């Protein structure tokens, strides 16, 4: 994880063959500039960044479902619950399950655990739109390689 630049997923662990669920991992770094202010002497991963990690996990699943044809953008966070603190050095397991897709929106149930214990969960809604002009798709494809996303399985040649 590099939370200061919003790189929250370190590895795509598994995508189910039906493209309904995904499992990713993210290791909270021992050192990060975000901990200077959150909180001095008691570093905690900000809850909004945990939600971002769950959103990015869902984003990889949505990209797989549409074969990288369109980009998911987080639109709504519903029913977010933060259950405990996350400290530097913890390895997070991030899960997402698609609940509904239609009319350019995707709804997913997401959760984050550490060593099997619940950390947080939320229902997230995404707007799925054509890629913006410019290099964004190329950048996302490079990040996909870094996080071990099986690009060859989900991108048309």
Kindly label every feature range from the protein language model.
Residues 1-3, 67:
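Short aromatic-glycine motifs in intrinsically disordered, low-complexity regions
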Residues 4-45:
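Catalytic strand-loop segment that frames the active site of acyl-thioester-processing enzymes
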Residues 6-8, 92, 106:
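Hydrophobic core residues within well-ordered beta-strands of beta-rich domains
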Residues 9-10, 77, 107, 121:
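Hydrophobic residues on conserved beta-strands that form the core of alpha/beta folds
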Residues 10-13, 78, 83, 97-99, ...:
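Conserved positions in beta-strands of structured domains
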Residues 39-46, 50-59, 74:
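Compact, glycine-rich, soluble single-domain proteins
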Residues 57-95, 119-129:
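Hydrophobic beta-strand-centered segment that forms part of the acyl-chain substrate-binding groove
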Residues 88, 99-157:
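HotDog/MaoC-like acyl-thioester-processing domains
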């Amino acid at each position: 994880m590099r939370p200061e630049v919003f790189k929250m997923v370190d590895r795509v662990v598994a995508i189910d063959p039906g493209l309904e669920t995904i499992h990713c991992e993210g290791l909270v770094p021992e050192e990060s500039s975000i901990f200077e202010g959150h909180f001095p002497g008691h570093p905690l991963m900000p809850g909004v960044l945990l939600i971002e990690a769950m959103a990015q996990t869902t984003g990889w699943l949505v990209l797989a479902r549409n074969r990288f044809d369109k980009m998911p953008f987080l639109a709504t966070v519903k029913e977010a619950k933060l259950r405990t603190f996350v400290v530097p050095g913890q390895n997070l397991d991030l899960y997402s399950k698609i609940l509904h897709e239609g009319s350019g929106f995707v709804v997913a149930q997401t959760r984050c655990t550490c060593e099997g214990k619940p950390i947080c969960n939320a229902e997230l809604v995404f707007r799925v739109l054509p890629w913006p002009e410019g290099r964004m798709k190329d950048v996302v494809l490079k990040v996909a390689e870094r996080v071990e996303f099986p690009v060859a399985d989900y991108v048309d040649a």
